[in-house]
Amino acid sequence: MKRVTEKDLENIVTRINRMTGNPEMAYVRNAEGKLEPQAGNYHLSFAYGGVTLHQMCDEGTGTHDVLRCGYVSKRELQSLLFAFIDGIQVEVKKD
């Protein structure tokens, strides 16, 4: 079985951001050079030897664990991300 890398997961998250019309970067620099959070952005979060999918809150004041799985292995998160994409595609087909 091929190793799941951080780059693999980043590519999947980029796909999710594009599918949902959300910003691809979690933060961008404004005219004053300060970082501004990008509401709606999906991104990876690493802690406790694992990884999870977070989304920036609407006001850019924090994040939440989208999949509510906590920090899991890269392989497990890859499976969860593919399931998440399947769910997005089902909703798109409904419209």
Region spans (language model):
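Hydrophobic residues embedded in beta-strands of well-ordered beta-sheets
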Residues: V51-T52
